[in-house]
């Protein structure tokens, strides 16, 4: 028997007669009580709150969680503990396995997704089991995605629509539904700060495309996973096969494009991108900034990405934040109808937590956790608990790109004007104001700011900063403009 922080496996060929549902539920409750006592309520709520019993036999226990990340974390950090607790409950147990809900095991398929197993092509026999993304409504589709795992929660149905993401959502739906008009904005490039729904939207496209395309040739990858797979293929002398698999697809979805590094890898990606686009195959890409600002990317890649349509997802407004909270509560109440949070409290959170969807989710989870042992939470207590996420909390880090966008909007010029060599007064003043604010509001050095403004020298930035400092002493209109811009930028970064 071997156990290194993960599930125990002993003699997988042994029969596993299934125990009754009532016995299983009782055993699961006892083991979970023991687990909570050993790890503490906070760790239990964080890591095991969504754990469910999927199967219980004489020798085997299968537990399910909603995400691959949660499965990996539990296996790596609590695998031995879980196995020992189940053995204490039933000494005949040989294996405790954690699986992801909504996935099934297959031995062959068209293209299957896996984080470690090899790609399986139609007609081949898998050398080991791999996981294929499925949902009950599409469980008979023998298709899938190889690459980064899909989270079954990330669908169009669960995506909260609002004014800040409506255009990006419409474009994503058009691609997922296979509209011919979608090729007019190919590639589709979605950019936003962290926690605003880029990954959710991209995975929703992949999930919907898998339902529609039979067989599906869909690949969803993070940029980091693409780099790892490519490096592994080179190491194993399988680079040619890897490239062929990537080229024989209908839809390529790349997340976190800002992390694509390395000259040779970027060169390969450029060839892949050119080939797919020239073949009228759809490409969807997401990053934390527009293509022109991905300075680490090869110029050819940036140019090709700019040839499609770039859409920004912005910070959610009050109505959208409230909608997200109401939907989150509805989902929780489906599992536990005893959970009650008043709409007044949800409205209060939506008004005070001004950040990303991830901040909203964090605020809701914090409230849900606290409510389990503080039944009557006042608004003052909620303020105290969520202080790190509200207006009174620490301000978020401001990016130069956010300053450039705000200044460009205010002075009715384009961002490209700010980066250009144009010397007209209508452009010079906004450019100097933006450089000044970049120096005041960010920790960036003068050379770095200069690079972000079209590759200018640091002395140009220094001149702009001093110029604005001199003007603001005598120009009350400019002083008010600067205060307004600081407030707008602060709200945008909140």
From Swiss-Prot:
BP GO terms, sorted: DNA replication initiation; regulation of DNA replication
Record keywords: ATP-binding, Cytoplasm, DNA replication, DNA-binding, Lipid-binding, Nucleotide-binding
GO molecular function, one term: ATP hydrolysis activity
Amino-acid positions noted as binding ATP in the UniProt annotation, renumbered to this chain: 195, 197-199
Gene3D superfamilies, alphabetized: 1.10.1750.10, 1.10.8.60, 3.30.300.180, P-loop containing nucleotide triphosphate hydrolases (3.40.50.300)
UniProt-annotated stretches for the region Domain I, interacts with DnaA modulators: 1-103
Chief subcellular location: cytoplasm
Region (Domain III, AAA+ region) residue spans: 149-371
Disulfide bonds: none
The family this protein is said to belong to: Belongs to the DnaA family.
Subunit structure: Oligomerizes as a right-handed, spiral filament on DNA at oriC.
Role played: Plays an essential role in the initiation and regulation of chromosomal replication. ATP-DnaA binds to the origin of replication (oriC) to initiate formation of the DNA replication initiation complex once per cell cycle. Binds the DnaA box (a 9 base pair repeat at the origin) and separates the double-stranded (ds)DNA. Forms a right-handed helical filament on oriC DNA; dsDNA binds to the exterior of the filament while single-stranded (ss)DNA is stabiized in the filament's interior.
Comment field on protein domains: Domain I is involved in oligomerization and binding regulators, domain II is flexibile and of varying length in different bacteria, domain III forms the AAA+ region, while domain IV binds dsDNA.
Protein name in UniProt: Chromosomal replication initiator protein DnaA
């Amino acid at each position: 028997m071997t156990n290194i922080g993960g599930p125990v496996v002993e003699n997988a060929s042994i029969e596993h007669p299934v125990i009754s549902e009532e016995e299983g539920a009782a055993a699961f409750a006892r083991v979970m009580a023991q687990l909570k006592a050993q790890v503490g309520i906070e760790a239990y709520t964080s890591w095991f709150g969504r754990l469910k019993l999927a199967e219980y036999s004489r020798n085997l226990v299968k537990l399910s969680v909603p995400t691959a990340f949660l499965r990996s974390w539990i296996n790596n950090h609590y695998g031995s503990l879980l196995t020992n607790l189940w053995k204490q409950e039933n000494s005949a147990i040989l294996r405790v396995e954690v699986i992801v809900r909504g996935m099934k095991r297959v031995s062959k398929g068209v293209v299957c997704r896996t984080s470690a197993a090899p790609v399986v092509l139609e007609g081949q026999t898998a050398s080991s089991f791999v996981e294929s993304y499925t949902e009950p409504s599409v469980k008979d589709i023998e298709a899938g995605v190889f690459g980064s795992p899909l989270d079954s929660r990330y669908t169009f149905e669960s995506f909260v629509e609002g004014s800040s993401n409506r255009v990006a959502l419409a474009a994503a739906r058009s691609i997922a539904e296979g509209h011919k008009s979608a090729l007019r904005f190919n590639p589709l490039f979605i950019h936003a700060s962290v926690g605003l729904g880029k990954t959710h939207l991209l995975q929703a496209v992949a999930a919907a495309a898998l339902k529609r395309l039979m067989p599906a040739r869909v690949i969803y990858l993070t940029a980091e996973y693409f780099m790892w797979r490519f490096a592994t293929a080179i190491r194993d002398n399988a680079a040619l096969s890897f490239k062929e698999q990537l080229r024989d697809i209908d839809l390529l979805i790349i997340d976190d494009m800002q992390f694509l590094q390395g000259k040779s890898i970027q060169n390969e990606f450029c060839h892949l991108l050119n080939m797919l686009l020239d073949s009228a195959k759809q490409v969807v890409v997401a990053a934390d900034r527009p293509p022109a600002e991905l300075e680490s990317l090869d110029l050819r890649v940036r140019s090709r990405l700019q040839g499609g349509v770039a859409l920004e997802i912005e910070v959610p407004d009050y109505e959208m934040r409230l909608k997200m909270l109401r939907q989150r509560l509805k989902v929780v109440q489906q599992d536990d109808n005893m959970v009650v949070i008043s709409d007044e409290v949800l409205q209060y959170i939506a008004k005070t937590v001004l950040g990303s969807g991830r901040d909203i989710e964090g605020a809701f989870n914090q409230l849900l956790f606290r409510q389990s042992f503080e039944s009557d939470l006042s608004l003052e207590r909620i303020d105290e608990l969520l202080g790190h996420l509200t207006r009174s909390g620490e301000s978020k880090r401001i990016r130069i790109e956010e300053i450039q966008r705000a200044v460009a909007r205010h002075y009715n010029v384009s961002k490209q004007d700010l980066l250009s060599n144009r010397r007209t007064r209508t452009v010079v003043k906004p450019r100097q104001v933006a450089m000044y604010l970049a120096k005041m509001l960010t920790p960036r050095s003068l050379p770095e700011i200069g690079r972000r403004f079209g590759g200018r020298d640091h002395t140009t930035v220094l001149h702009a900063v001093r110029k604005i400092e001199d003007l603001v002493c005598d120009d009350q209109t400019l002083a008010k403009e600067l205060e307004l811009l600081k407030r707008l930028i602060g709200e945008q970064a909140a």
